[in-house]
Amino acid sequence: MSWSFLTRLLEEIHNHSTFVGKIWLTVLIVFRIVLTAVGGESIYYDEQSKFVCNTEQPGCENVCYDAFAPLSHVRFWVFQIILVATPSVMYLGYAIHKIAKMEHGEADKKAARSKPYAMRWKQHRALEETEEDHEEDPMMYPEMELESEKENKEQSQPKPKHDGRRRIREDGLMKIYVLQLLARTVFEVGFLIGQYFLYGFQVHPFYVCSRLPCPHKIDCFISRPTEKTIFLLIMYGVTGLCLLLNIWEMLHLGFGTIRDSLNSKRRELDDPGAYNYPFTWNTPSAPPGYNIAVKPDQIQYTELSNAKIAYKQNKANIAQEQQYGSHEEHLPADLETLQREIRMAQERLDLAIQAYHHQNNPHGPREKKAKVGSKSGSNKSSISSKSGDGKTSVWI
């Protein structure tokens, strides 16, 4: 008998099964197929020819052999191997078809998009050079990356090793795998019970037959009963071992699935998932939460640069007070020191303005001085009024 075809099919099952399933496959090939093909046929080849009965009645010996062995041991075990391996072969065909279909679908998707891109953020160096402030700002912009480069990066990363269970689950074959495992277990139990009712646990050395056309009870003798009994017990042990492996594999799948679900929940609690933002092409921008300060225009240098800067600062302070208001808890402790510093700053500002007008208009210094004096008086009165009201603006 040639077993090469079935052996090649079972080798393909080896590539789509768990660690326990591979052990079961080894037991099936080594102990069942090899023992049945080599040992069984050599032991039972003379089973009917050496079955001798003490009668000369024609046809009585054949009828007694049929009563002794309704089904030959070797044919029973061959039938058992075929039926037990059938669910695995059907699972293999389904798995190959589904995996090929998935690969074909992925190939069509890759062909549909010629050069897909993946977006990643990168810093724009040209923007930094144009600012001329020699400061690193986290200006980011989305950069397109070829999908092939992304796949090469993913392939370079080592994948975690597993025993085949995760691969079966990722391919969507877990349900059909469990179904074929249950069918295989049912066949094992059925053949184990049938073997017990057909042959028992021992091959007796003689058999008493009383069937027609035998004239009376006759004794029939079996060749090599001890050898056949040992081989029968070995096949019982192999069947029981395969049944235990099936139960072990079911427990392995059950506990493994529970462990994976618990680990996934733990990872979700420890590491919150990243947010998936839709792809949009945006102009270079700063990350969220980063305050961008616009660089002010350059002020041409003049003799009144300090005065203009002070005027702009005072204007900004007034605008800030109008927007946010002021609170009494932010007032400085020493108001007299603050007023003294304000008067000194105002005097320096008056001197600078007088010097500027004296250089540009030497004929009318008195009129300008009078205007400046009136202006400074109004400013001092406004300062004193604001200080008395509890405001926190500072004039420079």
Swiss-Prot record:
Topology of the protein relative to the lipid bilayer: Multi-pass membrane protein
Subcellular location: Cell membrane; Cell junction, Gap junction
Coiled-coil parts of chain: 303-358
Family annotation (PROSITE patterns): CONNEXINS_1 (PS00407), CONNEXINS_2 (PS00408)
Family matches, as InterPro entries: Connexin, Connexin45, Connexin_CCC, Connexin_CS, Connexin_N, Connexin_N_sf
Side Cytoplasmic, residues: 1-18, 97-175, 251-396
GO BP: any one term: gap junction assembly
Biased composition (Basic and acidic residues): 147-156
Record-linked Gene3D superfamilies: Gap junction channel protein cysteine-rich domain (1.20.1440.80)
Pfam families, A to Z: Connexin (PF00029)
GO CC terms, sorted: connexin complex; gap junction; synapse
Residues that span the membrane, as ranges: 19-39, 76-96, 176-198, 230-250
Keyword Cell membrane: yes
Tissue expression remark: Ubiquitous.
GO molecular function annotation: gap junction channel activity; gap junction channel activity involved in AV node cell-bundle of His cell electrical coupling; monoatomic ion channel activity
Protein family according to the UniProt entry: Belongs to the connexin family. Gamma-type subfamily.
Purpose: One gap junction consists of a cluster of closely packed pairs of transmembrane channels, the connexons, through which materials of low MW diffuse from one cell to a neighboring cell.
Subunit structure: A connexon is composed of a hexamer of connexins. Interacts with CNST.
Protein name as annotated: Gap junction gamma-1 protein
Protein species of origin: Rattus norvegicus
